[in-house]
Amino acid sequence: MTDETAANGENEAGRQSQSSSLPLVVNAQYVKDFSFENPNAPQSLMADQGQPKIDLQVDVQARGLNDTVSEVVLSMRAEATRNDRTAFIVELSYAGIFTLPAQIQPEQARAILLIEAPRLLFPFARQIVAEATQNGGYPPLMLQPLDFVDLYRRQVLNRGSNGEVGHA
């Protein structure tokens, strides 16, 4: 009976773990669009020019592909300037295909797709940006983690919550 009790306890723990996990399946991740511009090279690569000012813009979009599958696109644009001259511009749209359970409510699906999905995509997008800037002759641009909850809240306040999956 001890073995049976232990097995039942393990099964119960497994069910609890599964029920508390995020109801999001990552089907694919990919670079949707990518650009690196180094408009003032080689002058911008000369030493002793000081740290560049980085302007970072981030957007998240989601669109349904069918009832349970959606594409989420994390778009980033970073422009580095020194002395009012552009050092580099990197633009990346990094996407993922995600599946949610059919019974999930639309507002919950919207929040998951615009908060949790980009949170999963971000480390990969960050690595691509870092490698691109390094390959462009600069130190790697290491983006700090982003607050996708705050980005989502601002989107809801700015555009209103109409229940459709969209931008954050």
UniProtKB/Swiss-Prot annotation:
GO cellular component, one term: cytoplasm
This protein's record includes keyword Protein biosynthesis: no
GO molecular function annotation: unfolded protein binding
GO biological process: protein folding; protein tetramerization; protein transport
Localization per Swiss-Prot or TrEMBL: Cytoplasm
A Pfam family per the record: SecB
Protein transport is among the record's keywords: yes
Chief localization: cytoplasm
Keyword terms: Chaperone, Cytoplasm, Protein transport, Translocation, Transport
Region (Disordered): 1-20
Family affiliation: Belongs to the SecB family.
Function description: One of the proteins required for the normal export of preproteins out of the cell cytoplasm. It is a molecular chaperone that binds to a subset of precursor proteins, maintaining them in a translocation-competent state. It also specifically binds to its receptor SecA.
Subunit structure: Homotetramer, a dimer of dimers. One homotetramer interacts with 1 SecA dimer.
NCBIfam families xref list: PRK05751.1-3, secB
Protein name: Protein-export protein SecB
Record organism: Rhodospirillum centenum (strain ATCC 51521 / SW)
Taxonomic classification: Bacteria, Pseudomonadati, Pseudomonadota, Alphaproteobacteria, Rhodospirillales
Gene: secB
